Amino acid sequence: MERARRRGGGGSGGGRGRGGKNVGGPGLSKSRLYPQAQHSHYPHYSASATPNQSGGTSEIQELASKRVDIQKKRFYLDVKQSSRGRFLKIAEVWIGRGRQDNIRKSKLTLSLSVAAELKDCLGDFIEHYAHLGLKGHRQEHGQSKEQVSRRRQKHSAPSPPVSVGSEEHPHSVLKTDYIERDNRKYYLDLKENQRGRFLRIRQTMMRGTGMIGYFGHSLGQDQTIVLPAQGMIEFRDALVQLIEDYGEGDIEERRCGDDDPLELPEGTSFRVDNKRFYFDVGSNKYGIFLKVSEVRPPYRNTITVPFKAWTRFGENFIKYEEEMRKICNSHKEKRMDGRRASGEEQECLD
């Protein structure tokens, strides 16, 4: 009896231990998902010391965080700093519908220079998504949902497998692009399946595996996040704010003894009809550039023109302005001549 009680007590204690570890579903520990909260608003991030292969630690400091909620997902955008410089960590946290569903997390890490390119790419995808929405509304108006579903299933092609746990259904690719920097590639794919449209951002290594890279951790595995298309604008706006607030500081730290930064001209803006155009001069490790933004809420499109291309841009603007002015004047003169001829004919008839 005493042996049975000891055996039963040991089993009960073990059960309590296992139950404490498996909060949220089997194989997922709440303490692993929310290790040591750095602040109450973003409790899912670990401490700033990251282990490396040699057994030491690389101090990583968190500078800023933003959170974007889209449908059943939360996206955390954190600007961090290591001994190599500043970088952006994007974490996607997905919570299932039921209590028994696991909380899944995926992440993406990229330098601030790549984040700036990602911001520009997002502008293109947002514009394309808006165009698809208008086009789809015109095409599907008057058709039943069943007809639309059959048509989409007929024209959709299965996609190659992606990261584990994505649970993606067969889908079609609506737009694709990529960013290549150093030995990494970032693929952006706007896709559609029976759940809706989404943007998948995937990072791959072009050479080498298992390296400790710029971000202070192993880069041997691909990283992927999936962003619902409806939230691309909000996600892009949060990204823009972080880049504007912390991108320039990263640039200054990378200059490493260069001369004092140049005093750049102040930005300007003007309004035309329902749009506003912004002109902002900036600089990074690649040189000086002019950022031209066209804003029509809730949309914002931006192009970046390097300093060496300003002269050619200016020449082309002046050229087309002069040509268009000549065309308009010629058209106006033709209309005036037509009116004069019509008036003379009327006088002859009188």
From Swiss-Prot:
GO terms for molecular function: purine-rich negative regulatory element binding; RNA polymerase II transcription regulatory region sequence-specific DNA binding. Its main location: nucleus. It comes from the Eukaryota. Residues 1-59, 136-172 are annotated as: Disordered. Residues 47-59 have a biased composition (Polar residues). It is found in: Nucleus. The lineage of its organism: Eukaryota, Metazoa, Chordata, Craniata, Vertebrata. Belongs to the PUR DNA-binding protein family. Keywords: DNA-binding, Nucleus, Phosphoprotein. Residues 54-296 bind DNA. The modification Phosphoserine is found at residues 163, 166, 342. Residues 9-27 have a biased composition (Gly residues). It holds the Pfam family PurA. It comes from Mus musculus. This is Purine-rich element-binding protein gamma. GO terms for cellular component: nucleus; synapse. Isoform 1 is expressed in testis. Isoform 2 is expressed in blastocyst and kidney. Residues 137-149 have a biased composition (Basic and acidic residues).
